[in-house]
Amino acid sequence: MDQMAKIDEKKPHVVFIPFPAQSHIKCMLKLARILHQKGLYITFINTDTNHERLVASGGTQWLENAPGFWFKTVPDGFGSAKDDGVKPTDALRELMDYLKTNFFDLFLDLVLKLEVPATCIICDGCMTFANTIRAAEKLNIPVILFWTMAACGFMAFYQAKVLKEKEIVPVKDETYLTNGYLDMEIDWIPGMKRIRLRDLPEFILATKQNYFAFEFLFETAQLADKVSHMIIHTFEELEASLVSEIKSIFPNVYTIGPLQLLLNKITQKETNNDSYSLWKEEPECVEWLNSKEPNSVVYVNFGSLAVMSLQDLVEFGWGLVNSNHYFLWIIRANLIDGKPAVMPQELKEAMNEKGFVGSWCSQEEVLNHPAVGGFLTHCGWGSIIESLSAGVPMLGWPSIGDQRANCRQMCKEWEVGMEIGKNVKRDEVEKLVRMLMEGLEGERMRKKALEWKKSATLATCCNGSSSLDVEKLANEIKKLSRN
């Protein structure tokens, strides 16, 4: 209450609503901290379980030095924070069903009870399914959508309604997934040249297995048209033509990435590596890297939601071992179809010589470690923009959501990566790891990655495109809050 006594009720107060997944929370929390540093009050809303996990992993330790920044929670229908035995995607769908039914009333009640009146809402673009825009309208509070993905990912999502209108999707049946139909070039998407249907989010295909996701995607694309302000986690130099096309559709677009580079410039040095993770990060990963030569290690992490079969894990494992390069592999407890990975003993022993296996790590710290020379990734946007910021080339194995579009751009447009086929084979993994770490192609990609690192650094400098857009965003929030 002492802190509340000093509150200036005329100061803008932004309420953040993240999509309840690790990468989205991490991204939105970074922007929230940046805007807090620029003089705005912040309330950040998590589900009960996600906030419990964030606290347990040390993700809120900085809060005592951030007066005017508050966390609030809403129920999620889960009894406790459990990972084991449940596929992350299944748990997420269950959570989305709960929030679609309940979030509207929970949010209204929460906002009306805030001791400082909310003046602006920044909502994850993927959270509109939970009636967030309707809630903002009822409260008469301006809302800004934040797309934590790349411009290419947003444009791919946004085109779902057009693809449906043109009757390209839904696909008629499962045979269309293997009969060459997915190789169709879509040449009319603004800013995306010669992209194939298979490079778009697989949710768009609307097979029986993912029709729920297609409906979510279609609804999300429609609701994007209802707002006048939009934030995208990219930098203009990386996706110039796409950003230009998006700005021709939407009146107010802010490109504010890479967020970590911006955060590094305004937070105290000792807090730059604060965790934003729902998992406990293992310092042993970095300690192991400290003993390795520069550019000698492949970092492997398939993100927080992707799952794979034990067969895929074994193929990746032998491919890494046979490449004869050091590797740091993050294997989550629920990576194998939602269950702990039980690795064959022969592979486990073979991996001990060159590999180090951890359950989670500080990814930005790892990618910026001099020992890391390549990144085998699921192509989640958070991972790609962090890798570009560190100047690290990639191998991509995309799975869900925007990852296919990200991988396509990474390989074809930004020229910093190569794709591993969906059906994982150890020989292909070995070959591509060798190309990445020791071949001319890897050398070329590393040089290109370092060029993008320089561009990202310039974008986040004092007069860089992203720095200027953050200032514009903060000023616009202040303006919206006065109206």
Curated annotation (Swiss-Prot):
CDD domains for this protein: GT1_Gtf-like
Keywords from the named record: Glycosyltransferase, Transferase
Enzyme class: transferase
EC code: 2.4.1.-
Highest taxon of source: Eukaryota
Transmembrane stretches, start-end: none
Binding site for UDP-alpha-D-glucose: 304, 360-361, 378-386, 400-403
Signal peptide: none
UniProt function note: May glycosylate diterpenes or flavonols in leaves.
Family affiliation: Belongs to the UDP-glycosyltransferase family.
Name under which the protein is recorded: UDP-glycosyltransferase 85C1
Species for this entry: Stevia rebaudiana
Gene transcribed to yield this protein: UGT85C1
